[in-house]
Every structure is written in C-alpha cells, then in structure tokens.
Amino acid sequence: MNILITNDDGYRAKGIRVLSEIMKQFGNVTVIAPKHHQSGMSMAVSLGLKQLAWRELDEEEVDRAAIFRTRADIPAYEGSARWSYLDATPASCVKFGLNTCFLDNFPDVVVSGINHGSNAASASCYSGTLGAALEGALNGIPSIGVSLDTLDPEADFSPVVKYFPAIFRKLMSSLPERKGIIYNVNFPDIPADEIKGVRTGYQGRGRWVREFKMWDPAIYAKLGITPEMLGQSSVPKCEEGEILYTMVGDFLDDPQNTPQADHLLMKSGYISVAAHNIDTTDYQEVSRLQGNVEMDF
C-alpha cells in the first residue's frame, strides 16, 4: 500500500511524526507537510505564480527540527518514510504530491494528521487537516483526517497509537464504491484505558463567540506556541495606528445537537468517526427550490 501523509501543524509537529510511524506498518509512507503551521486553511491552495519552496528531508533532520521533546509515545516500526516539506497549504501539499511523487500512480490512501486539536463539529469547516483529506477525495483517493482533542505540542498520542490501526483497517476494508468521501476521526484527550470505544456520528453544530482578543503573549505561551511554529521569527511589529489582535474564542454548542454529534461523542469518552463528502449540495433544499425559483424564459 502506498500512503501519502500530510497535516496542517507543519512537519515539525509531534502529531505527524507519530502518524508516520503508525502508518509504516501498512506500507510505503511518503510525507509532504507544510513548512509552517497552516491551521484554519481549510481547502485553500496556493494559486497563480507564487513560488513554493520544497525540500526533501531525512528522518534525522525531521527529529532535529522537532518542536517537541517527549517521545515515549512514538512507536518505532520497521521501514522508513520519505519526508519533505512544502511552503504551502495542506491541500497544496497533497496537490504537489499527486503531481510529482505520485504522478504515474496515485497513492492508495491519503491520511492527514495527527492534528493537535479537535476537528469535530464546526471546526471541520475550517480545518486544514480535513482540507488536505478533501483534496485527496477530490481525486478519487480514500482519505482520512485524524485529530486529538488537545493543542498541547507535547500531547500524549498513545491512544491514537493504540486504537487508530484497527480503525484504519476497518475503514479500508469496507470502502464504498462511491468516490469523494473522507473520514473524520477524532480522539478524546483522555488516557487510552479510559476510552469507551468507537462510535460513528454526524458533524455537530456550533459557533465560536468572543473570538478576537487584543494580543497578549501569555495566550500563546499558555498553549506552548512560539512565533517560529507559525512561520514567524518574532511577533509582528505594529505599524503606526495598528492594534494587534489574536483569534481564540469560546465554542458555543448548538442546543439541537443530539448525543450522536461527533464532538459530543468525544465528550462522552468515545472516538468519533464522521463521514464527509466533497459534494456539499443540500439535496432536500434543491428539491424545495424546484417549485419556488425555477422559471422558463
């Protein structure tokens, strides 16, 4: 099996290092990840004549560049992974891979992650992790996004190491004939022995409130985020008259959600699996509109 891996936290993040090791047991691993942090990019791509820097890396270089220290939860499987970074969005990384490394034969699967932070509920609309998976699905490739519900750069990924291989096997052994589907897998941030199981659910609904706050270095320090992780050498300086803001916010749950909403399944101690599709048509609404807006001229 040929596997293409990417993420939106950048090649230096712990999550993608863990994922690359997990996937070695399933076949040949190629990693093409963003050079810098690209969260919230959804399916954005780098258009036009913008120059995109690409560089091959060996695994020792990846380890030296890592922005994490704890490694006890990183498995070690036989085999190696081909690593490189692209100074572009996650979806562009997949595009680049399909047009270079896999030009003659597409990979058997695209796996994006492991994301530092939940991509359940409305977060999936913004997710660069899922945007990369959607790019794979757009090309007819089975694609999976994997996330752990914590922003901690030193996160303990042992629950993903323990349970994702079985989830992956089940998903790959029961693929539908229809193309264009991605699987959004979200792990709760609890010890592996406290996880109750795996449940399928739907994309929960909600929105963020109080999203913008004036810049305070303590916000990023609390999350363990440095300017370098965001592709910056320092905090941007203000021009005259400017005020720096950062986007954080609090998630407000939609009261119409049922317990089968993916983010609520996680809250209940389950790994949630939701199926998304590149076709965003609301067919029920299309049927309703047929009798309301269709006209002949």
Kindly give the residue locations of the regions a language model identified:
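A cross-family phosphate/adenosyl-ligand binding-site feature
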Residues: 3, 14-99, 106
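Short beta-strand segments
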Residues: 6, 32-34, 112-115, 146-147, ...
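Short glycine-rich anion-binding loops that position phosphate/pyrophosphate groups of nucleotides
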Residues: 9, 37, 89-90, 115-118, ...
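Alpha-helix C-terminal capping segments
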Residues: 97-104, 131-142
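Glycine/threonine-rich flexible loop motifs
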Residues: 118-127
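Glycine-rich phosphate/pyrophosphate-binding loops
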Residues: 123, 137-159
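Active-site glycine-rich loop that binds ribose-phosphate moieties when present
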Residues: 126-133, 146, 159-172
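C-terminal accessory domains and tails appended to enzymatic cores
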Residues: 172-178, 184-297
